[in-house]
């Protein structure tokens, strides 16, 4: 029987990003792709944040991040805020450090009781870091488009790694006027992205405000993607089209992103909302090897 049978979980959302938080620090088990997909079939989520025993002194947990297709991700900003909310709520802490595949993340209570800040680390721009399948010296724009050659619908995205690959397409019109459900999977799986990519449409309202919509790698169309908001804010600042502190509007809500000048770390501040707590029924994993 799966060690997840009868185990408790918490369902949350980070401004619309559907999150399951699963604390396995008391269980020596690594969730399998089949188990992750089984959970998603009963408790729909965009990402599942699994807390495992920390590997280093001074950290709260090692976080494994699963997409609903069973694949793993290196980063999920909205999910991290949900984890932080749960941990702080139980321990009374106001700051903590967590381990992820993308590195150590420092987190703390935000400027209001329902706000949490996650230091998402330093963005990477090298074509091999993102990664891309071929060399681009300047990743502020790369050659990629959807639509006719002489009149592309989307073209020339900025690419950034926030521990996971992001492509940001700049648009002049409302981000909701584009058929992202159609273009998203094509771009996510484009050969230029050997590890696939998160695809974002972004409209710069002014230097302090950006609206965006994201097709999330391994999860599909989402109401919010925190790492995509970070990547978009950084990409806009690299192009000198936005300030380093920006207000981001996503379908599910609002985030504040700061690309801190003194050390190039990206700070994301937003809410985390509790929905319900439950336990996994053993039958859910009956067909899982």
Curated annotation (Swiss-Prot):
GO annotation, cellular component aspect: cytosol
Coiled-coil intervals, chain numbering? none
User: Where in or outside the cell?
Assistant: Cytoplasm
Protein's job:
Catalyzes the stereoinversion of LL-2,6-diaminopimelate (L,L-DAP) to meso-diaminopimelate (meso-DAP), a precursor of L-lysine and an essential component of the bacterial peptidoglycan.
Q: How does it assemble?
A: Homodimer.
Give the PANTHER family listed for this entry.
Answer: DIAMINOPIMELATE EPIMERASE, DIAMINOPIMELATE EPIMERASE, CHLOROPLASTIC
Q: Which NCBIfam families match?
A: DapF
- HAMAP family assigned to the protein according to its UniProt record, in alphabetical order: DAP_epimerase
Which protein, by its recorded name, is this? Answer: Diaminopimelate epimerase
Instruction: Please give the organism.
Output: Bradyrhizobium sp. (strain ORS 278)
Lineage of the organism: Bacteria, Pseudomonadati, Pseudomonadota, Alphaproteobacteria, Hyphomicrobiales
């Amino acid at each position: 029987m799966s060690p997840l049978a009868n185990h408790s979980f918490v369902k949350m959302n980070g401004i619309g990003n559907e999150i399951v938080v699963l604390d396995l620090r008391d269980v020596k088990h690594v969730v399998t792709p089949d188990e992750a997909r089984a959970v998603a079939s009963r408790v729909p989520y965009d990402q599942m944040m699994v807390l495992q025993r920390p590997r280093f002194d001074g950290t709260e947990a090692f976080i494994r991040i699963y997409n609903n297709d069973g694949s793993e991700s290196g980063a999920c900003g909205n999910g991290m805020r949900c984890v932080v909310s749960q941990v702080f709520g139980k321990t009374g802490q106001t700051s903590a450090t967590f381990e992820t595949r993308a590195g150590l993340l420092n987190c703390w209570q935000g400027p209001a009781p329902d706000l949490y800040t996650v230091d998402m680390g330093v963005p990477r721009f090298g074509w091999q870091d993102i990664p891309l399948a071929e060399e681009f010296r300047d990743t502020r724009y790369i050659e990629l488009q959807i639509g006719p050659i002489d009149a592309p619908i989307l073209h020339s995205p900025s690419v950034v790694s926030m521990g996971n690959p992001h492509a940001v397409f700049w648009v002049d019109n409302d981000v909701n006027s584009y058929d992202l459900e159609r273009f998203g999977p094509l771009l996510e799986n484009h050969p230029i992205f050997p590890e696939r990519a998160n695809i974002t449409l972004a409209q710069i309202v002014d230097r302090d405000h950006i609206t965006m919509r994201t097709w999330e790698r391994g999860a599909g169309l989402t109401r919010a993607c925190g790492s995509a908001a970070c990547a978009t804010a950084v990409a806009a600042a690299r192009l000198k089209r936005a300030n380093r502190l920006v207000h981001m509007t996503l379908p599910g809500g609002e985030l504040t992103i700061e690309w801190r000048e003194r050390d190039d770390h990206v700070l994301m501040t937003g809410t985390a909302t509790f929905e319900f707590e439950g336990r996994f029924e053993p039958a859910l994993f009956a067909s899982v090897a």
